[in-house]
Amino acid sequence: MFKLFAALRKERLWDFTGGIHPPEMKQISSEIPLRRIPLPNLLIIPLQQHLGPEGELLVKVGERVLKGQPLTRGNGRTLPVHASTSGTISAISRQVTAHPSGLPELCISLVPDQQDCWGERHPLPDYRAMTPPALIDHIHQAGIAGLGGAGFPTAAKLNGGADRINTLIINAAECEPYITADDRLMREHAAEIVSGCAILSHILAPERVLIGIEDNKPQAIAALRHALQCHEKIQLRVIPTKYPSGGAKQLIKILTGMEVPHGRHSASIGVLMQNVATVYAIKRAVIDGEPLIERVVTLTGEQMHRPGNVWAAIGTPVKHLLQNGGLIAQNKHPMVIMGGPLMGFTLSRLGVPVVKITNCILTPSRDEFSVPQAEQPCIRCGACADVCPARLLPQQLYWFSQGKEHDKARGYHLQECIECGACAYVCPSNIPLVQYYRQEKAEIRALDDEARRAAEAKARFEARLARLEREKAAREQRHKQAAVSVSNSDRETIQAALQRINLRKAGQTDDVAAVNDPRQAALAAAIARAKAKQAGATPAPAATDSDAAAPAPQDDPRKAAIAAAITRAKAKQAGATPAPAATNSDAVAPAPQDDPRKAAIARAKAKQAGATPAPAATNSDAVAPAPQDDPRKAAIAAAIARAKAKAKQAGATPAPATTDSDAADPAPQDDPRKAAIAAAIARAKAKQAASGHATTEPVTVQENTDGARRQIHRATLQAAYASGAGADLTAAAEGATPESDRQAAIATAIARVKARQTLVNGEVPKPVATSTPTDTQKAAVAAAIARIKAKQASAAPSEE
């Protein structure tokens, strides 16, 4: 019946599996009051004293700081650190800190000025008027972390369970041997601890607040009960002494009977736990405005001459604490343990600083701790499994840790190990199981970090590929839209350009240009005619009249001029060597119609070509008529006829008489220009008859040439004057449109060049048959040419 009523009581307690009862050894330091020690000559303040990354530096070397001034900036799970006293920053470097690995970390070296001047503080005495988020942020800026040993940021823990907490547990068990820091703190500052509990209750608003304390601390229990008289919501629970009842999951099981699920936090079941020293630091931060810059540290062990609990500033070297505690070293390198005998670690050097999670400095003698025994093989006794409070299999975890079987160790819940050291305490083979577990955890964390970085790199790579694909798709879409928006004319231009590029590769550029551009077509035609002339250097059948009369393209005079110029140039190149007579098509190639400069160039080239002997021109070359609607060309033809007649009169031997048809072919009377030509021819014949007596005297070729030139020039002027008189009548009668002056100048130049070439060469041409009698102009011109050639033939023997 008694057990039934006890089970129904609210103060019911539960038990956890396993656990041990080692010697407590707390009486060495528990009966000595708290004391303060003087500041050291140098404080070494690590930037990372909690679970999380280090903060951003706010100070620099040589800067003077005040007590409580932030040295780093904290955001999220990054806690700031503060100056433990006023002084000057002497260095910021990496130094060995209080960690089992002994690896150096970034630290701030502060030289105290021994004035201990406080900086600006922000107390909140009326904290009930503040909102929970504001209080949590204030706690975060004070740099408060869990002081029980884990070092988890208190503000992060409060934020994580703000709306789900039903039970708030204050851990005052302090179950590990030798450590009495919390015991002395509760004895001397019980009221402040209760105030801290009230602040947490205001922030979390839990249904109940439980303080769990072991029954081996009667004085602390009495002090707390006295302080809780005015706080009915806060309950004090005294639990049996058993190691490790101070573990978070173990104390939750003892006070509530609930177990925290694997891989989850206590907040998932509505329970939040805080250490009693952390609660005291919260009270000092909120009500007094003091950041976490000092804590209570137990100095104990049989080698300590003045053991006890001291207020140690954060960053105080362990060597300074040992000097204050009166260490009596039994050898040159005494054993110094930071923490308790079960969960602590041996320091590699005594210059490491005190940090926020440092609760004890233990210096045992040889009699306290037996000489370490050599490690022996596991005998599979199972004692470790019996005492494990987490209900794990330490033996299997040991094998997996030895064999580097990380997956199996993870599968056997190695992460649930609280590293209490109970398994190593009972191991008969002296196997340091906790050390193996710590090493295996570190390796697993390293593998997890590497896998996480690889996953992040893969995610970045995949995101980059996705971005490139999106950009490519966007470009293709823009190109498609641009292709759709191209007009028909632009599309034709693009297609023509592509066709030219493709045919240029195949050597067909000229054909494509001729097809797509009329100007290029004319140029191609001229090139073709020039090539035909070059091919005509070898004997070939004469071209038909239809070929000779093929007109050049009339749609663009510039194209025609270009084609004619190219044809003449190639014809002159072919004329440098003896070649057969040109065809009719060569004779009717039109001269440039719109450029006097090209005409001048053609005249110069014709003069150069005339320096070498050339075959006599055919009838088609000689009788190519000028256009019938141009009086200037008619005058030029008449002048040429008169010049040839005079040259015949000046010959050494008499030339054969011309027929009546040659001399008396009248031009049609209905055309004044033709009449002028006929008159000029008649005057030339009369002059020849009058000067017949002078033919017996020899005349040089040079004199004949000069006279012919003067006569050609005079006849040209007279014919131009005569033709000009009837131009207006002809234009009015026939409605013809006169062509440009350039054509007349070109025709005149051609006539002069041909006459000079004939006289200078002095060749004896063959008689040339007259053209069809139906064209009076052609007949007259042919007769004049025949007479000039006969005169040259008669003058040649006389010179010899």
UniProtKB/Swiss-Prot annotation:
Cofactor(s) the protein needs: [4Fe-4S] cluster
All residue ranges annotated as the 4Fe-4S ferredoxin-type domain in the record: 367-398, 408-437
An example Gene Ontology biological process: electron transport chain
Cofactor: record remark: Binds 2 [4Fe-4S] clusters per subunit.
Keyword annotations of the record: 4Fe-4S, Cell inner membrane, Cell membrane, Electron transport, Iron, Iron-sulfur, Membrane, Metal-binding, Repeat, Translocase, Transport
Chain sites annotated for binding [4Fe-4S] cluster 2: C388, C417, C420, C423
InterPro entries on file: 4Fe4S_Fe-S-bd, 4Fe4S_Fe_S_CS, Ion_transpt_RnfC/RsxC, Nuo51_FMN-bd, Nuo51_FMN-bd_sf, RnfC_N, Soluble_ligand-bd
Enzyme Commission number(s): 7.-.-.-
GO molecular function per UniProt: 4 iron, 4 sulfur cluster binding; electron transfer activity; metal ion binding
PROSITE patterns assigned to the protein according to its UniProt record, in alphabetical order: 4FE4S_FER_1, 4FE4S_FER_2
Superkingdom per UniProt: Bacteria
Binding positions ([4Fe-4S] cluster 1): C378, C381, C384, C427
UniProt subunit comment: The complex is composed of six subunits: RnfA, RnfB, RnfC, RnfD, RnfE and RnfG.
Protein name: Ion-translocating oxidoreductase complex subunit C
Lineage of the species this protein comes from: Bacteria, Pseudomonadati, Pseudomonadota, Gammaproteobacteria, Enterobacterales
